[in-house]
Amino acid sequence: MKLNLKIFSLLLIGLFSLQSSISYADETSETVQLSLVITASDKINLTTVSRVEKGINAYKAIKALVVVGVKDTSYGPQIMSLGGVEAVGNTYWALYVNGAMSMVGAHDVILLEDTFIRLNMEDF
């Protein structure tokens, strides 16, 4: 009887150990690849490839990779400087997502799959 109780105890402990490891495996966050290119003629040329949390917005991902200066607007944060290079006068930071100019700001671009983002200083 004591032998059966010991075996039962070991099986029970093993089951709880296995269940704990399964729970941790399910809680790991998924990531996607972000390829980021920042260009401004002869002022800055930065390229980086990084894994970021799936579902994060592009603004948060960019901010984690490079120093970003912003102006708060009613539409969300407007990027004013990247890596210390400021858009002044008639220039702005144009946002391209997977090769196409974005119709929304970086705050509204959600990274659900591997994404290529280019921020290029352009004239109005």
What are these regions (language model features)?
Residues 9-19:
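Bacterial N-terminal signal peptides
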Residues 1-8:
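Bacterial N-terminal signal peptides that target proteins for export
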Residues 2, 17-124:
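Ubiquitin-like/PB1-type beta-grasp interaction modules and other compact soluble beta-rich domains
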